[in-house]
From Swiss-Prot:
It is found in: Plastid, Chloroplast thylakoid membrane. This is ATP synthase subunit beta, chloroplastic. ATP binds at residues 172-179. Its EC number is 7.1.2.2. GO terms for biological process: proton motive force-driven mitochondrial ATP synthesis. InterPro entries: AAA+_ATPase, ATP-synt_VA_C, ATP_synth_F1_bsu, ATPase_a/bsu_AS, ATPase_alpha/beta_chains, ATPase_F1/V1/A1_a/bsu_N, ATPase_F1/V1/A1_a/bsu_N_sf, ATPase_F1/V1/A1_a/bsu_nucl-bd. It holds the Pfam family ATP-synt_VA_C. F-type ATPases have 2 components, CF(1) - the catalytic core - and CF(0) - the membrane proton channel. CF(1) has five subunits: alpha(3), beta(3), gamma(1), delta(1), epsilon(1). CF(0) has four main subunits: a(1), b(1), b'(1) and c(9-12). SMART domains: AAA. GO terms for molecular function: ATP binding; ATP hydrolysis activity; proton-transporting ATP synthase activity, rotational mechanism. It catalyses: ATP + H2O + 4 H(+)(in) = ADP + phosphate + 5 H(+)(out). HAMAP family: ATP_synth_beta_bact. CDD domains: ATP-synt_F1_beta_C, ATP-synt_F1_beta_N, F1-ATPase_beta_CD.
Length: 498
């Protein structure tokens, strides 16, 4: 389906034309509204409740129609708090689904689920808006060519490459560098692909959302002086929002991303943090709508809801949306219906390891746990595939030997195993990399490493050509030439001390 943004939001003209209903029942964030016979709104239409509460405060609540109940009643889910609403209040049917601003005007700004700016930087140009509900692109529009999405991050490109227009699950706890990795990807896609990014904070902590915004301003991803030069749009539906907002904020972010893909014909990066909270919000709403709970108390429509979001994230002949989704795994149970349903849609998984972060190896991507469907010789080429497999074998052997080393020491290993350990430690350090967005904290200039350079570097380490170099020469460098130059500097420094 082609993207057809409207040139103005869903406006309702004169009072006579307004389709008016009245609130009949309020159950938390769910409202039942009675409309005149023959004037029922459609499913997904936006309804607006305007008026004053008992204290005289202005109320403006937007809801979305979810069910037609019969007897001229509809059931709708509120997108903001329902405090102060009373039975009998007037409800206006806007006659269209929720629409949000799209295009260049959204860059550098923070929006809520309704597409309203919440960053106190003034109004946003709303001449071009688009409804948040659309069908996924038709088969004939899809780009079926399998191609690698180069990120410039060595560990990702070599061992768990991303697919252009694919979906990646990002697994990581607090403090292992998830935010920095997200910001680096936003920075690299802007520089290498000329693309933009959209960040959807679904059920985020308000503090995390604020931290991300501040760090993006500090690192230049959001340009404060010239906001139009920014490379990212942010959409937040925070933890304190009602479930309706958390359930729909992912679609708001996706709609903004689709415009950049279909109209501007760009490669777009879409971040969703956290996809589990999208499911959780749907589960809360489902019970209030009177649906029978399914396995583990989740909504019976779990697969459908997930599919309607995920199937819109794809490559078309115009451009691509590559999505990186943080996945929370409840109680570390991968068989839980929420993560299990998400896994069915993912092309790659990037696992962040607390052990690597503790060693100071950043990005702390676990090279053995991270996987990708793209790592096949037919897609990445024989040379890349062989190198990646040898790197994994070397690191796996090192992992197996670690217990022996801890008890008996390196000297008790065979000559071959000692060599494997030495190369594995070099590989582990060479998988680290200085980031552009961390430059302001570390003082080290960031490095973007092309895929060919990455493969060449690891081939040289595996071949044994660099066995004589000290392992610290490989730590936090870009390509392999920088590692050899660093080794010479270390040697020179050592000679000077003597």
């Amino acid at each position: 389906m082609r993207f057809n943004p409207t040139t103005s939001g869903p406006a309702v003209s004169t009072l006579d034309e307004k389709n008016l209903g009245r609130i009949a029942q309020i159950i938390g964030p769910v409202l039942d509204v009675v409309f005149p016979p023959g004037k029922m709104p459609n499913i997904y239409n936006a309804l607006v409740v305007k008026g004053r509460d008992t204290v005289g405060q202005q109320i403006n609540v937007t809801c979305e129609v979810q069910q037609l109940l019969g007897n001229n009643r509809v059931r709708a889910v509120a997108m903001s708090a329902t405090d102060g609403l009373t039975r009998g209040m007037e409800v206006i049917d806007t006659g269209a689904p929720l629409s949000v601003p799209v295009g260049g005007a959204t860059l550098g700004r923070i929006f809520n689920v309704l597409g309203e700016p919440v960053d106190n930087l003034g109004p946003v140009d709303t001449r071009t808006t688009s409804p948040i509900h659309r069908s996924a692109p038709a088969f004939i529009q899809l780009d079926t060519k399998l191609s690698i999405f180069e990120t410039g991050i060595k560990v990702v490109d070599l061992l768990a490459p991303y697919r252009r227009g694919g979906k990646i699950g990002l697994f990581g706890g607090a403090g292992v560098g998830k935010t920095v990795l997200i910001m680096e990807l936003i920075n690299n896609i802007a520089k290498a692909h000329g693309g933009v990014s959209v960040f959807g904070g679904v059920g985020e902590r308000t503090r995390e959302g604020n931290d991300l915004y501040m760090e993006m301003k500090e690192s230049g991803v959001i340009n404060e002086k010239n906001i139009a030069e920014s490379k990212v749009a942010l959409v937040y539906g925070q933890m304190n929002e009602p479930p309706g907002a958390r359930m729909r904020v992912g679609l708001t972010a996706l709609t903004m991303a689709e415009y950049f893909r279909d109209v501007n014909e760009q490669d777009v990066l879409l971040f969703i943090d956290n996809i589990f909270r999208f499911v959780q919000a749907g589960s809360e709403v489902s019970a209030l709508l009177g649906r029978m709970p399914s396995a583990v108390g989740y909504q019976p429509t779990l697969s459908t809801e997930m599919g309607s979001l995920q199937e819109r994230i794809t490559s078309t002949k115009e451009g691509s949306i590559t999505s990186i989704q943080a996945v929370y795994v409840p109680a570390d149970d991968l068989t839980d219906p929420a993560p299990a349903t998400t896994f069915a849609h993912l092309d790659a998984t990037t696992v962040l390891s607390r052990g690597l972060a503790a060693k100071g190896i950043y990005p702390a991507v676990d090279p053995l746990d991270s996987t990708s469907t793209m790592l096949q010789p037919g897609i990445v080429g024989e040379e890349h595939y062989e190198t990646a497999q040898k790197v994994k074998q070397t690191l796996q052997r090192y992992k197996e030997l670690q217990d022996i080393i801890a008890i008996l020491g390196l000297d008790e290993l065979s000559e071959e195993d000692r060599l494997t350990v030495a190369r594995a430690r070099k590989i582990e350090r060479f998988l680290s990399q200085p980031f552009f967005v961390a430059e302001v904290f570390t003082g080290s200039p960031g490095k973007y490493v092309g895929l060919a350079e990455t493969v060449r570097g690891f081939q040289l380490i595996l071949s044994g050509e660099l066995d004589s170099l000290p392992e610290q020469a490989f730590y936090l460098v870009g390509n392999i030439d920088e590692a050899t130059a660093k080794a010479m500097n270390l040697e020179r420094g050592g000679n000077l001390k003597k």
